[in-house]
Regions:
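Dinucleotide-binding Rossmann-like beta1-alpha1 core, especially the glycine-rich loop
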Residues: 1-51
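Short aromatic/hydrophobic contact patches that present stacked aromatics
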Residues: 12-16, 62-64, 150
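General beta-strand structural signal in soluble alpha/beta enzymes
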Residues: 41-44, 92-93, 123
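A short, glycine/Asx- and small/polar-enriched loop/turn
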Residues: 20, 51-60, 101-108
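Flavin-dependent oxidoreductases
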Residues: 100-170
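Helical element adjacent to the flavin cofactor pocket in flavoenzyme catalytic cores
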Residues: 63-120
Length: 170
């Protein structure tokens, strides 16, 4: 089945509030170019205000990504789970994975509730994804969780900005 969830390509802005943050914005721009993100550009204060009149007066620049878009994460996850279920995926909730090993024609997964063999494993462990990665890869990684805030507004308040707006990380 086809995944059925709404997607809106509205572009995104990473906003810089202080001139001394410009090197961070420029580094983010360069990383985006290296990663092949099309159409990236840095907007000055005037260009940003023209694009988003309600943006903070403190905003001095922004990285604009016209290909950015938004989905409802709840609807997306439900659509993916329904699609996976329709394609025969088995779900094992409240089950801790203790070991993951490659075997002939797939993987052996040892868990708190038994051992399973499968052809494919999807690592969807969020901030714990590094633990699964490190079970099977010689190149070890570490995920450092970050906190952020998303503001969910009433639909009647949804016209204050037209792009997805992020603060410059750091």
């Amino acid at each position: 089945p086809i995944l059925d969830f709404p997607f809106k390509r509205n572009g995104s802005l990473v906003v810089c509030l202080h001139e001394d943050e410009m090197p961070g914005l420029e580094a983010l721009y360069k990383r985006g170019i290296t990663n092949g993100v099309p159409g990236l550009r840095i907007l000055n204060r005037e260009e940003l205000r023209a694009m988003e009149p309600n943006i903070s007066d403190e905003a001095c620049a922004a990285l604009y990504a016209p290909t950015g878009g938004i989905v409802c994460p709840f609807n997306l996850n439900i659509a993916m789970a329904e699609n996976a279920n329709a394609n025969g995926v088995e779900f094992h909730f409240n089950t801790e994975v203790t070991d993951l090993r490659p075997v002939e024609d797939g993987w052996e997964i040892r868990t708190s509730k038994g051992t399973y063999k499968t052809r494919y494993v999807v690592n969807a462990a969020g901030v714990y994804a590094d633990k699964f990665h490190n079970m099977v890869s010689n190149k070890k990684i570490h995920i450092t969780p970050r906190r952020g805030d998303y503001c969910l507004l009433d639909k009647t308040a949804g016209n204050h900005v037209s792009h997805t707006v992020f603060a410059l990380p750091g």
